[in-house]
Amino acid sequence: MTSRTEAVKAYLLDLQDRICSALETEDGGARFVEDAWVREAGGGGRTRVIGDGKLIEKGGVNFSHVFGSGLPPSASAHRPELAGRGFEALGVSLVIHPHNPHVPTSHANVRFFIAEKEGEEAVWWFGGGFDLTPYYGNEEDCIHWHRVAEQACAPFGADVYPRYKAWCDRYFHIKHRGEPRGIGGLFFDDLNEWGFDTCFAFIRAIGDAYVDAYLPIVQRRKDTPYTAEQREFQEYRRGRYVEFNLVYDRGTLFGLQSGGRTESILMSLPPQVRWGYDWKAAPGSEEARLTEYFLQDRDWLAH
């Protein structure tokens, strides 16, 4: 490993530890179970899963560091000149699915790729972001989530938050449904334009912001009573989450195409999901308001 890779790895392992600790404390019941694994083709990771807690129905916070002799198609699709290069990929990826339908699902990811070829300069980039998927929308939560995202981006330029917010809205769009997966946040990839030190600082700012963005929302909503019908709606909306992850998500596709660890890759899927044929929310209902108002391309910081 190069000194750059070592620095990124040390940060990611510490980030995984800190996020797991914060989530365990908030749950107050369940604890993460760690599964350390080794990849035959090169590398390994620490999968940490949690479930059946007071707050968290299912969740995972994964660290992986894998390497190989050739980049898979999902990683080189936008940069065909890198096809066939050896690579290292490091990242922390997490998804939290709460029991209570009033608590949104959250997802975050920070990652580092380096692609090498003998006799040529190494090419590296960072990617990541975080996004929120509510089932019952609340403006206060949406504004808070995006405010924390904006504050994390602010030291790196006034254009960074709007640029990566818009990218998130485009990326987490379920094309065959014509709707977004959630209310967005930040998404970026192929980031190397600022030089390594600044890009690495940005990744740390985004990784460190996740807990500040998510836990205040959890604390406000986790004790809200809910009905069996609301739980059913949550499971129906979770189906959209599954559809996006299995059809479009670059991280999922990269993991599967590179011979990654299937259990860790599919950790993001919720434990209980529902599909109903041509199901529609009742007009004027909270359920209808989710798609009509909250799941729209909206500037939440203009409120």
UniProtKB/Swiss-Prot annotation:
It comes from the Bacteria. Its cofactor is a divalent metal cation. Keywords: Cytoplasm, Heme biosynthesis, Metal-binding, Oxidoreductase, Porphyrin biosynthesis. It catalyses: coproporphyrinogen III + O2 + 2 H(+) = protoporphyrinogen IX + 2 CO2 + 2 H2O. One of its GO terms (cellular component) is cytoplasm. A divalent metal cation binds at residues 97, 107, 146, 176. The record marks 176 as: Important for dimerization. GO terms for molecular function: coproporphyrinogen oxidase activity; metal ion binding; protein homodimerization activity. Pathway: Porphyrin-containing compound metabolism; protoporphyrin-IX biosynthesis; protoporphyrinogen-IX from coproporphyrinogen-III (O2 route): step 1/1. Substrate binds at residues 93, 109-111, 259-261. Residues 241-276 are annotated as: Important for dimerization. It is found in: Cytoplasm. Gene3D superfamilies: Coproporphyrinogen III oxidase, aerobic. Disulfide bonds: none annotated. Transmembrane segments: none annotated. One of its GO terms (biological process) is protoporphyrinogen IX biosynthetic process. The active site is at residue 107. The keyword Cytoplasm applies. Pfam families: Coprogen_oxidas (PF01218). PANTHER family: COPROPORPHYRINOGEN III OXIDASE, MITOCHONDRIAL, OXYGEN-DEPENDENT COPROPORPHYRINOGEN-III OXIDASE, MITOCHONDRIAL. Homodimer. Involved in the heme biosynthesis. Catalyzes the aerobic oxidative decarboxylation of propionate groups of rings A and B of coproporphyrinogen-III to yield the vinyl groups in protoporphyrinogen-IX. This is Oxygen-dependent coproporphyrinogen-III oxidase. The gene is hemF.
